[in-house]
Amino acid sequence: MSSLSRELVFLILQFLDEEKFKESVHKLEQESGFFFNIKYFEEKALAGEWDEVEKYLSGFTKVDDNRYSMKIFFEIRKQKYLEALDRNDRAKAVEILAKDLKVFATFNEELYKEITQLLTLENFRENEQLSKYGDTKSARSIMYTELKKLIEANPLFREKLAFPSFKASRLRTLINQSLNWQHQLCKNPRPNPDIKTLFLDHSCSPSNGARALTPVNLPVAAVARPSNFVPLGVHGGPFQSNPAPAPNANALAGWMANPNPSSSVPSGVVAASPFPMQPSQVNELKHPRAPSNSLGLMDYQSADHEQLMKRLRSAQTSNEVTYPAHSHPPASLDDLPRNVVSTIRQGSVVISMDFHPSHHTLLAVGCSSGEVTLWEVGSREKVVTEPFKIWNMAACSVIFQGSIVKEPSISVTRVAWSPDGNLLGVSFTKHLIHVYAYQGSDLRQHLEIDAHVGCVNDLAFAHPNKQMCVVTCGDDKLIKVWDLSGKKLFTFEGHEAPVYSICPHQKENIQFIFSTALDGKIKAWLYDNVGSRVDYDAPGQWCTTMLYSADGSRLFSCGTSKEGDSFLVEWNESEGALKRTYLGFRKKSAGVVQFDTTRNRFLAVGEDNQIKFWNMDNTNLLTVVEAEGGLPNLPRLRFNKDGNLLAVTTADNGFKILANTDGLRTLRAFEARSFEASKASIDMKVSTSAMASSISPAIGKIEHMDAGSPARPTPIPNGIEAMSRTMEKPRNLDSVDKSKPLELTEIVDPTQCRQVTMPDSKDSVSKVARLLYTNSGVGVLALGSNGVQRLWKWIRNEQNPTGKATASVTPQHWQPNSGLLMANDVPENPEGSVPCIALSKNDSYVMSACGGKVSLFNMMTFKVMTTFMPPPPASTFLAFHPQDNNIIAIGMEDSSIHIYNVRVDEVKTKLKGHQKHITGLAFSTALNILVSSGADAQLFFWTADSWEKKKSSAIQLPPGKAPVGDTRVQFHNDQIQLLVSHETQLAIYDASKMECIHKWVPQEALSSPITSASYSCNSQLVYASFADGNIAVFDAESLRLRCRIAPSAYMPQPTPNSAPIFPQVITAHPQEPNQLAVGLSDGSVKVIEPSELSRRWGVGVAAGSDKAGTENGRPSSSSAANNSSSDQIQR
């Protein structure tokens, strides 16, 4: 069919839609096969109208077209089958099995047998793979998410998912233009012609009434159904019958459709698949978004489900797709950060900038002087500055030592945050990279590497094989991959010029790196030693940088040629070809232009003393911003993750911050919080210092209370110290300078925090022994001393739109319809039993024990999937290996540690060294070690592959204290620092050196034994509970006390004869850093959060007041807050 005929079909579709002929619209979409209406397909799929779903699909593909199409039809028919089983319609299920699913038996007979066996089950959820299948609505939603991915990846749907962009009522416009042209040809044109028909050409009637009638003959061929997708020519010979064992080559296969001869990968390599493929289907497999697996029972707890449900709710009011004038809503200039809100002077030329991935107003800046600075752009303050210095000259190469002596000047080339924001990487113009660990407002030296000979041109973080790594490139034409201990994992050779930039990325489960060199070559590498997978020429063939859009779906590059011509392009990944070339650059540039992307919609480039913006879908320049002047010729720029702030360099050695409306709101909110916090702090300090001369420190109280109250106040050391701190410039509490004492906030009243008690949790017989949040953050799981596990879940509703755990809403005590309990085997005398528990990463299974066998429970059905490791000895601690859920470290009652392989039901090795039972286990993937702790107050460090003992260390106990008591261990997010808790102390260890670096001991208001401790989810806080009911919040970097939560704030007043109630265990929410949960000695479980006003621990809120920092809740100084300085151990 000609392109004009095809466009006519689109005009008719638009006309039918505007005239509300909805059924005709979808019928024409199906019959023409030109436009697949994904919204209509979604509506029918979620409504379960399976016949219409398949009928509509049939206009675009058939079951056996390719493996994408096969899996699409399989998922639809499988869902149809499961729904019949779910409503107990066995006859219908058998019919679907025989008529609809039988076709797939020839491709995967084993799967067909497994599906057939579901008929024999009373509830198909008894099948392990279907145990997470929820209700029909949620299952359809998950299915649709999978179908959408398959459709987008299917080459038969290429160019058919987006409706062309043209003006509304275009067909009417063309007809009117035709009529106007016909009217101009009239011999006697009338001023207001009367158009009565379109079947005949228009002609104004002559005066005598005669009319000339001319039939219309449109030069348009009859509409025919398009032919099937014609693949690109298969290169490299016939299809290989033996598929590759791993799908690595498939990720970049599209780029290899016509590779240069230098490509080192055999062209016939494709991903393994259980279905036989014809040679004509090879190129259809060469698409970067292949299905995650072949026909199978999908995960009904998909990560995409939550986002999908949000979108479904927002789309309920308009299910039908419309055909707008543009395929995407026009880009609003208001979405762009164009307004200058601050100008900050750095002092030397700014070379590189990067916003923190979660703290959206924290900007890292690298300079030509080698200096690295963190700026809080909300308050326009420097958080920390690190001048360049060599950390360990002796470890550097002789070449570098000679170079730095000869020419000591050095510049930053790149600063980059790790995806989790815990690490900051810096590369330099001579050999070195530095990696800092970021802690609140502090940068701690973590790793220095002499990485390349000459300049290190770029640095980025990647996560191959679930291991955080640093990727670098340099003038030595090499790309290198390093782990966080400084070990070199890979060296990629193949570029013939200095490597200019790198772009690590992941598509599905394939991880790779794009690299560009100064000769304009683009190469791609997998994390192996095979060599480059791609060899392409970048536009301009000189300095080029590559970036993906925020959602990772679109690839862009920007660069400049040696002649000064600049290029900004979008790539078609599936074909390795240019998709768009953006217009708007001036003729010649005197350097290399820099660019960035944001919101999956906009591109920004610094050129000609301006910032130029493009909409990704339009090659024409969207707008230009001069930022009130003062920009250099080629300014460098960087968006924050939300896209509401933009940093751009200035000509006078500084940078400007530009914001849109959302960005302004973010900055104002930050300023308001900083002002309130500082105002409260200053008010308190002035008042206390005025009283200090006449009041003894021992009786200076924050609030009036009985002497016997558990919330007894902390004395103010002296008025002079308090007054001196009033002169300090206040700053955001989350970025306090650690060299200065933190202020202590006392929370003594229930109005000063939010709390909720889990329903049906109180049990005087069973104490809460272990407590966990689910990894998704929607539930709390408690293991009692009686071996029974209880689960509470928060429901998504208007009061709790996220569905996450919150202290503002009471959760549900969750149990399956069967009424089963998750009860462990318990010995006849359970008093000496040590309960232990571990949860799988996807929240599907929980493993626990309480003096008996270890049981693996299904979290949906509460059924016991298997048991193992019967006593003696009994298990006392459980930990999944972070990289292999089939490997479990099990601490035992006899002081040994068993490394157990679930798959083969075998203990692989036993680790011995402790003298008493094991009380804690923690893995570090960064250091590849396992740390164990025992009731003997000992720590052991083991290698996590050979399981050899590296070192043992006894924790430092107070004089006269016997080495007994549970010792717990937990790794910081950086996988280097280790939190060690014992009833006598909290300690932070540097696990890479196996040395204690900070310690805090109970004292004064917090003098009772410590019962439990945990890092917050971002590892910036440490929560600790005490035997007298107090809860303390510490700054994680230094163990300085930030906040004390008295028992009176979250527990009722005890009666005279009642047993004391206190927290047995404390745990932190996996996504909310200021939310904690405690399990109490009376069996109850509580979730606690700061008040709505303060939002963070350490910001005072008055009891019974709606203002922060007045009287009761205000912060106070405490010697307990500062004792870590005296106990700090030198590194």
Curated annotation (Swiss-Prot):
Q: What's the main place this protein lives?
A: nucleus
* Record-annotated LisH domain positions: 4-36
| Cross-referenced InterPro entries | CTLH_C (IPR006595), LisH (IPR006594), Quinoprotein_ADH-like_sf (IPR011047), Topless_fam (IPR027728), Topless_Znf (IPR048419), TPL_SMU1_LisH-like (IPR054532), TPR1-like_2nd (IPR054080), WD40/YVTN_repeat-like_dom_sf (IPR015943)
- Identify the Pfam families for this entry: LisH_TPL, TPR1-like_2nd, WD40, zf_topless
State its location(s): Nucleus
Quote the cellular component terms of the Gene Ontology held in the record: nucleus
List Phosphothreonine occurrences by residue. T214
- The segment annotated Disordered runs over 1099-1131
Gene Ontology biological process terms from the UniProt entry: primary shoot apical meristem specification; regulation of DNA-templated transcription
* Residues covered by the CTLH domain: 34-92
Q: Where are the WD repeats?
A: 345-385, 407-446, 451-493, 495-535, 585-624, 629-668, 763-802, 829-867, 870-910, 913-952, 959-999, 1005-1044
Q: Which parts pass through the membrane?
A: none
PANTHER family, alphabetized: TOPLESS-RELATED PROTEIN 1-RELATED, TOPLESS-RELATED PROTEIN 2
Annotated function: Transcriptional corepressor. Negative regulator of jasmonate responses.
**Quaternary state and interactors:** Tetramer. Interacts with NINJA/AFPH2. Interacts with SMXL6, SMXL7 and SMXL8. Interacts with SPL (via EAR motif). Interacts with SPEAR3/TIE1.
Q: What's the entry's take on its domains?
A: The N-terminal TOPLESS domain (TPD) (1-209) binds directly to a 12-amino acid LxLxL EAR motif peptide.
The name under which this protein is listed is Topless-related protein 2
| Organism expressing this protein natively | Arabidopsis thaliana (Mouse-ear cress)
The uppermost taxa in this organism's lineage are: Eukaryota, Viridiplantae, Streptophyta, Embryophyta, Tracheophyta
